[in-house]
Amino acid sequence: MAKIVQLPDDLSNKIAAGEVVERPASVVKELVENAIDANSSVIEIDVEEAGLASIKVLDDGEGMDAEDCRTAFLRHATSKIKDENDLFRVRTLGFRGEALPSIASVSHLSIKTSTGEGAGTHLTLQGGRIISEQKAPSRRGTEITVTNLFFNTPARLKYMKTIHTELGNITDVVNRIALAHPEVSIRLRHQGKTLLQTNGNGDVRHVLAAIYGTAVAKKMLPLEARSLDFEVKGYIALPEITRASRNYMSSVVNGRYIKNFPLVKAIHEGYHTLLPIGRHPITFIEINMDPLLVDVNVHPSKLEVRLSKETELHELIRDAIKDVFKQQQLIPSVQVPKKTAPLINKPEQQKLDFDQVREPAPLSDSDVEREYKPEPSFSAMKLSSLVKDPPPSAPVEREENVMQDTEPEWPGAEEYTPEAAPAVQAEPEQAGENVQDEETPKERVPIMYPIGQMHGTYILAQNENGLYIIDQHAAQERIKYEYFREKVGEVESEVQDLLVPLTFHYSKNEALTIDQHLDDLAKVGVFLESFGAGSYIVRCHPTWFPKGEETTIIEDIIQQVLDDRTIDIKKLREEAAIMMSCKGSIKANHHLRDDEITALLDELRRTSDPFTCPHGRPIIIHYSTYEMEKMFKRVM
């Protein structure tokens, strides 16, 4: 008797559902993508109990006739591809013909659909089997209702998370689809409460406002770049607006939301040292390319894709982001708190003019608390020989009735916990407001006249635009980082011979790795010579190694090689420069002379990125004259 048998269709569909339908969010994703493929302009999604009780998706798309409706629930039945050549030219979101039969096999499903010509079709299925077929109204479009999800797969139901978590997953999926298709009006409701409403006018900024709040959307900069193979566009948040999770970084390829680590890496490299360690930006990157350059047939969920010419795309995105920030003045301006106006309803957000001036969200007391709170002690400077006090500028008339944004910001897939978007302590000014196109990098930071030092840590300076507070350690870190970044690698002509060679010892396994990368280590100034089993000596080092730190620096660089196992010379030089700049910079509670402060500010202005230290912390904070006068009630 034969041992190998062909599985029945209902069992095959359940197996396929294990990959396609992982949770209620998977059902929502597949149904909404089908609606978009049907050229819908309006999609309404209603879920009960985070989709475990019911999911209903209603669209105004092309609909289906009775025959197509029945065929759609057969395995691998689709209208989107005809032959294997179409697999390499996929322009639709779906094409595998697995979603509907997989969903139907693990639920009770009802579908009403019509092409708008004649009566429609109403099918009812249980566990993938059609149990009734009736006529339906001729309204053009499709309505699918899924209930009792996973009723016949209790093991899958057992591993569902809490209602909040599953709803968070659904919200995350719908948010990303809405970003990828701003031309479609999408409404998501849970238990009758609207969670997302987009107007479908094609402007992705309005979708960003609906998802992240208007204050965040107004602080996002447009991004555009082209090459022979790729067209990249989207919006990237100013560096001050960060999150602890990567879930706020959305990438879309040919209208399909994807997860791709190399793209995330390219975005981080574009921000470079503008981001604090462990923080991630809010970004939306849309990439259009020839379908031949992307393989979407990698996984049934179609979230993972393979990209051709990935290195070229990586460089295009990274350089485009860098170019955007090179044109911006990124000095954060602290704003005076003001009374919070009533909340704006989500649908009204779609009507906001993005060119209007807005005040940032108000600061709470906790936002401005400092860990270091001694009695004020200022070291005053005699400035009469340097510069006269700038004349007080007339306060600029500002719109006082601008509504503050306190809209909730929907989280990513980890947990659904709606809460007000946190106020950013130091919101930068709207991009491009104070920056002229013809400015050089030196003019990105204005000339500042020092007036003192606070706690031996912060430099106070002024000009006609107000007060500036400079973190002296972060400022010198940036200066030294850019110096060392240029010096690392220029080692051949600038070396210091040692009277007594430095000796280093490693295990046999570590020595094998080091031996493979001796040439790479030499390129960053570490000249190792074998000195027995697992031992090495260094007879010279670059003259720019910080004095007294030579042994530590060499050990740290070698450890980077041992940790990574593979060498990226550019990355190694970068890490070495960051390490040396941090070790050699002035620390807190270090009082500087007047001439030292002036020299430090002049050197900072000459750096290419004078706004953050190499670790992403801000260097300069700005209080405008208007805000100072407002705090002292000189203006109301």
UniProtKB/Swiss-Prot annotation:
One of its GO terms (biological process) is mismatch repair. Keywords: DNA damage, DNA repair. Gene3D superfamilies: 3.30.230.10, Histidine kinase-like ATPase, C-terminal domain, MutL, C-terminal domain, dimerisation subdomain, MutL, C-terminal domain, regulatory subdomain. Pfam families: DNA_mis_repair, HATPase_c_3, MutL_C. GO terms for cellular component: mismatch repair complex. GO terms for molecular function: ATP binding; ATP hydrolysis activity; ATP-dependent DNA damage sensor activity; mismatched DNA binding. Residues 348-358 have a biased composition (Basic and acidic residues). PROSITE patterns: DNA_MISMATCH_REPAIR_1. Disulfide bonds: none annotated. Residues 341-420 are annotated as: Disordered. PANTHER family: DNA MISMATCH REPAIR PROTEIN MLH, PMS, MUTL, DNA MISMATCH REPAIR PROTEIN MLH1. Belongs to the DNA mismatch repair MutL/HexB family. This protein is involved in the repair of mismatches in DNA. It is required for dam-dependent methyl-directed DNA mismatch repair. May act as a 'molecular matchmaker', a protein that promotes the formation of a stable complex between two or more DNA-binding proteins in an ATP-dependent manner without itself being part of a final effector complex. This is DNA mismatch repair protein MutL. It comes from Bacillus licheniformis (strain ATCC 14580 / DSM 13 / JCM 2505 / CCUG 7422 / NBRC 12200 / NCIMB 9375 / NCTC 10341 / NRRL NRS-1264 / Gibson 46). The lineage of its organism: Bacteria, Bacillati, Bacillota, Bacilli, Bacillales.
